[in-house]
Structure formats: structure tokens, C-alpha cells
Amino acid sequence: IPAMFEKGMEYGVSHMFIASWNRKGFDCNYPEYYPDMELGTAMDICRGIDAVNRRGGFATFYINARLFDLESDFFEPVGRKMAIKDETGEILTEQYGPVRFSLNCPSDEQWQKQLIDTAVFSAKAYGLRGIYLDQLGSAEPFACYDRTHSHGNIGEYNQGYVRVLSEIKRQMQANNPDAFLMTENCGDIYGSYTWGNLTWNGADYDEYYNMFKYTFP
């Protein structure tokens, strides 16, 4: 991490945005966010981020905001309960590369707590200033018909993520007033909670992206 940071500083870049730090790498094993042993120990990551901070830089870690690996040991006892269910009670799934995931319900307190705690813990434990929540501002919202969930009706998807963003930001900034959140792409109801947005495919895939860009230049 320090070596990569120093290389970035040669180009005037002081922000390290780190993905694939978790066990098994990118788009795999979510939401189990533990350092991949090939990259070193958890303390190695702490030392690396501390070196970045001491050099006047800052770091952001990637966390996916909605996926649960179906092959995870914890999917059946934990993940299935958190999943969005359709009208027939079936879980919604998506596939990225060879890995298939369930879609977690952001308007249910179970997934809210898991996501909030994971983000806040990562920021505190590793000395991060930022947390990036992938897919949050980009992926399609879905209705959830699971009657065991805490949401009052089937259409609270976006309101659930507003609570998640608000609570993560509040807790992170209580520990570090300069802490921030980022999301993939952007949305008007999420924008006031974020410091930045990764908008790599918004123009091609997100509805009303050009209207958003015009309104919020």
C-alpha cells in the first residue's frame, strides 16, 4: 500500500481507493469482508493505511451494498433471511462472472445492521477516511414481499438505503469529522450523504442520468 501510494503521489494523487482487498477478491464471498491472506494480515493493512495517513493522504475501501454470495457458508443461516423475495417467496439473484449472489433487502433491519456495522468497523479498524458502497446508486430497486422483514410495505427500497447512508455517515463522522461516503453512480435522494460518486457507466445504463447531470452540474 505505501509503495502504491508513493507512485500515485508522483501524479499528485493523494486518495487511495482500494477494492479487491477482501478474501477471494472482487465480486466474490460478499459480504464477508476480511483481508485476503495473500495480501497480508489485518495489521499489515492497518500499517499500510497508517503510512498513507501520515504522508498526508487518505484511503477508501470498497464494500458491496447489496450482494450475498450463494456459496457462502453463511448464506443459508443468515443470507437467505436478508434476501429480497418476489411475490412467490423466491429470492432475487444476479450473477457477476462465475459467482451468483442473492440481493439483500435494504429496507429490512437485518441487512441494514450488517451493512452499517461492516462499513463503520472497517473505517475504525483500518483508519480509513472513506467507504465506497458499490451498486447503491446504480442498481435497479426492487419490491420485497417478505412479510418477516421489518419494512412496512413492499416499496421501501430507496428509503432503506437513505437510512443506511445517514447512519454510516453519522457514526463514521463521530469518530472522524472528515470521514465520507462514496457510491457507484448517483441519485438525487442519496446525493446529500455522499462526498463523491463513481459514475463510470451512468450515461449508458442509468435512467435520467443526463437530467441529473444537468440539474447538479
Specify the residue positions occupied by each region the protein language model found.
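Hydrophobic pocket-lining residues that define ligand/cofactor binding sites across diverse proteins
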Residues: 8, 122-123, 172
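Glycan-recognition surfaces
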Residues: 70, 74-113, 159-217
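Extended, polar beta-sheet/loop recognition surfaces of beta-rich domains
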Residues: 154-156
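Generic enzyme active-site microenvironment
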Residues: 132-133, 182
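Aromatic-lined carbohydrate-binding/catalytic grooves of carbohydrate-active enzymes
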Residues: 2-116, 126-130, 136-150
